[in-house]
Amino acid sequence: MIAQSTRLAAAVSSSAASAGVSRIAASAMASTIFKRSPGNSFNSFKEYRENAKTYGPLSASLATRRHLAHAPKL
């Protein structure tokens, strides 16, 4: 009887611990997918894509000025 209750208590505590760890891991993974940093002013990837579609040519000209892209030959 004591062995059975000990086994049951161990099973319950280990499943609760693993559920807590998986919940923490899931939230950590979700927060690191698109993390905001000083060099990243976008809140989401969707916002980044909308901005890239709108300002695509401007970004290309800035990249050319900063020698990050191939400049057209004059």
Swiss-Prot record:
Q: Name one GO cellular component term.
A: mitochondrial outer membrane
Task: Work out whether the entry's keyword set contains Mitochondrion.
Answer: yes
- Provide the alphabetized UniProt keywords: Membrane, Mitochondrion, Mitochondrion outer membrane, Transmembrane, Transmembrane helix
**Membrane topology, from the record:** Single-pass membrane protein
Q: Does the keyword Transmembrane apply?
A: yes
List locations, semicolon-separated.
Mitochondrion outer membrane
Q: What parts of the sequence cross the membrane?
A: 8-30
Q: State the protein's name.
A: Uncharacterized protein YJL133C-A
Q: Which organism is the protein's source?
A: Saccharomyces cerevisiae (strain ATCC 204508 / S288c)
